[in-house]
Structures are given as structure tokens and as C-alpha cells.
């Protein structure tokens, strides 16, 4: 081969190996938020309630918080927005064990890489409950949410095998909160 062709091929190889500016959402120790159950209803008066599971396994509840930071259409929240939301939560009467938290956070990467069914309108006035898991990108200070399941006026669900397990687990937590 000619030296110029070798130089061109080498340059192309080097350019191809440079990583792009992809947002790298991961699970890490800096992440404050892992899971969220969020219920909103605009019928018969505004209702907004739910709970968050944080990095310590605490179940933090909220009920009609003022100035809540909702994620955008792509389920993105800034680190500042998450911190503000967490400050509006109250520690709940239940918590998640470290083993349980490790088990369920291990499912997030699978859920994040799966598709969600099409949104269906099946009712009115029931409101909408969303089960969401979160990944964090420390380099840009953003949280990316992944819809696990939506119930109520509108329904859809993540097609990943682990989704049903996570939803069942979160419903158990929600049921335990209702007992207090």
C-alpha cells in the first residue's frame, strides 16, 4: 500500500474511535432519585401525590406540593429540579432495604433500553398514575426518567420482562403507605 493510503486509513480509524457527545445516563452513588410513583388528577379539583425512593432506600411522600418540577416530554429533570422536589417531600413510614434497593435498581438499565406500548385513552376523571425509574448523568447534571407503566385515564407499559416486577413492588410500597 502507498504511504498516503495508510495515513488516510489511520486517520479514519482514529476519528471513528473518538466517542461522541452522547448523554450517558447511568446508575451511580451520586444519584439521589431511583423510582417514583406519581398520581395527577385534574377532575373534581386538582390532586397531585406520590412517592419517591431515594438512594438510601427512603420512601419520600408528597401530597399537592407547591411549585413541583415536572419532567419535560422526554422525562428529563435537572439535578436542581430533583433537589427542589426532594425538599418538598416528607419521609414516609416505610423504607426499602439495601438488598431490595440493589435488586430493583439493577432492573433500571433493562427497563431503560426497552420500548413502551402506545398510549391508550380508556377513561375519564380517574387521573393518571405513572411508575417511573430514573437514571442520572453526572456530567451534565440531568436525570432521565423511563416510564415503567401508566394507569388511569391513559394506559401504556414498558415491554421489558422486569417491568411487571417493579410495578408490583412499587404497588406493594404504595399499599403499605396507605396503611398509615
Name these PLM-found stretches.
Residues 17-20:
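C-terminal motif of bacterial Sec signal peptides marking the signal peptidase cleavage site
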Residues 1-9:
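Bacterial N-terminal signal peptides that target proteins for export
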Residues 23-43, 49, 110-180:
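Short, well-ordered, aromatic-rich surface patches in folded extracellular/luminal domains
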Residues 45, 52-123:
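Surface-exposed acidic loop/strand-edge motifs in secreted or periplasmic proteins
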Amino acid at each position: 500500500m502507498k504511504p498516503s493510503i495508510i495515513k488516510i486509513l489511520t486517520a479514519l480509524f482514529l476519528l471513528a474511535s473518538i466517542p461522541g457527545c452522547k448523554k450517558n445516563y447511568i446508575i451511580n452513588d451520586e444519584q439521589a432519585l431511583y423510582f417514583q410513583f406519581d398520581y395527577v388528577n385534574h377532575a373534581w379539583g386538582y390532586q397531585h401525590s406520590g412517592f419517591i425512593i431515594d438512594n438510601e432506600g427512603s420512601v419520600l411522600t408528597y401530597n399537592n406540593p407547591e411549585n413541583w418540577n415536572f419532567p419535560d416530554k422526554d422525562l428529563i429533570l435537572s439535578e436542581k429540579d430533583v433537589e427542589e422536589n426532594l425538599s418538598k417531600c416528607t419521609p414516609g413510614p416505610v423504607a426499602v432495604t439495601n438488598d431490595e434497593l440493589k435488586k430493583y435498581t439493577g432492573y433500571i438499565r433493562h427497563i431503560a433500553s426497552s420500548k413502551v406500548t402506545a398510549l391508550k385513552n380508556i377513561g375519564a376523571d380517574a387521573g393518571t398514575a405513572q411508575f417511573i425509574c430514573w437514571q442520572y448523568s453526572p456530567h451534565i447534571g440531568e436525570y432521565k426518567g423511563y416510564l415503567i407503566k401508566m394507569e388511569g385515564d391513559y394506559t401504556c407499559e414498558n415491554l421489558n420482562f422486569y417491568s411487571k416486577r417493579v410495578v408490583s413492588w412499587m404497588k406493594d410500597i404504595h399499599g403499605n403507605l396507605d396503611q398509615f
